[in-house]
Regions:
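A residue-level marker of the well-folded mature domains of exported/periplasmic proteins
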Residues: 1-174
Length: 174
């Protein structure tokens, strides 16, 4: 499907952590895509599609992320792309976006909510299961492993952990 944004559209992106290599790569890709889009559409000056990319420096700083989402919504963006640290904590912001007819695209974390228009994410459960297979192979299909999750409230982290532990329990019980 063709993407034909209106001149002057604002794509607001709020991520979990602006300091991580993953999100730096996402920002680089999104910046290049918006540049290409502006060239393709012939947008110049104020007609260019604008991309803002914000978030806390620390992936555990839920309050800072909520404040960032509030500030972004005050700018009335055309669309909000969000990778929430804790989806339950930003319900009011999602309701505000819906009330202002700002579509919400969730990045990197699955979420089940009528307040979200679409989700763009890895199948984190499958990624966790694949990590378990590789780990089991590396240790001869038996032994003990420890799980060190990076973010307890992150749906992506929870799904990866669940995929990993269920794969280990099912296929590598020793």
């Amino acid at each position: 499907e063709e993407l034909n944004p209106e001149p002057g559209s604002h794509i607001a992106v709020v991520v979990k952590n602006t300091k991580s290599n993953f999100w730096a790569t996402v920002k680089k890709g999104m910046t290049a895509a918006v540049k290409d889009l502006n060239e393709k559409m012939g947008y110049k000056g104020d007609d260019k599609v604008k991309l803002s990319f914000e978030g806390p420096a620390d992936e555990l700083d839920v309050e800072s992320q909520i404040n960032t989402i509030d500030a972004v919504l005050a700018e009335n963006p055309t669309v909000l792309c969000l990778s929430a640290i804790d989806m339950e904590s930003c319900g009011a912001q999602l309701e505000e976006a819906m009330g202002n007819e700002i579509p919400v695209v969730i990045l990197d974390s699955g979420v089940e909510s009528e307040l979200v228009n679409t989700v763009c994410a890895t199948d984190n459960y499958a990624a966790g299961a694949e990590a378990a297979k590789k780990m089991a192979e590396a240790i001869g299909n038996k032994g003990q492993v420890a799980i060190m999750a990076h973010a307890e409230t992150s749906k992506s982290s929870q799904d990866r952990e669940k995929g990993f532990t269920e794969e280990i329990a099912k296929n590598y019980p020793e």
